[in-house]
Design a protein with these regions (language model features):
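Short, structured surface patches at the beginning of a domain
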Residues: 1-132
Length: 132
């Protein structure tokens, strides 16, 4: 079984409409990039002032277990409101050799390169599966 593409979403207020809006933005982004299915890890009603959140902890465990190849987040504030916490988490993701895509940072050439590589890889894997 291949590695999953994950998305992490978080809202501080327990508002299902806001959470669904965040997920929809990530889904649209993934579709625009030619990315297949995305597994969501969502913390609804959790503060971004620390990293102690159930879905984020499950995502971390899955990354450490080698189950995740890419993580998509809408913006860094979804990970943490404290920029230092957010960067510590992003460094951990990088150390685990997981690609991180931040949707609302499209002008970053590294992000563009990752998205292009990921889209090409996903299409190649899809073609292999169809021709198997």
């Amino acid at each position: 079984m291949g590695k999953k593409i994950a998305a992490y979403c978080r809202v501080a207020s327990y508002d299902e409409d806001v959470m669904e809006g965040q997920k929809d933005k990530v889904r649209r982004f993934a579709e625009e990039q030619g990315i297949g299915s995305v597994t969501f890890y969502a913390d609804n009603g959790y503060s971004g002032l620390n990293l102690n959140r159930p879905a984020l902890e499950r995502l971390d465990a899955d990354m450490q277990g080698g189950k995740i190849s890419v993580v998509i987040v809408l913006d860094t504030a979804r990970v943490a409101r404290n920029i230092f916490l957010a960067h510590d988490w992003m460094d951990k993701v990088n150390e685990l050799d997981v690609k991180l895509i931040i949707v609302n940072q499209p002008d970053n050439p590294v992000q563009a390169s990752i998205r292009k590589s990921l889209s090409a890889s996903w299409r190649n894997d899809k073609n292999k599966a169809e021709n198997f």
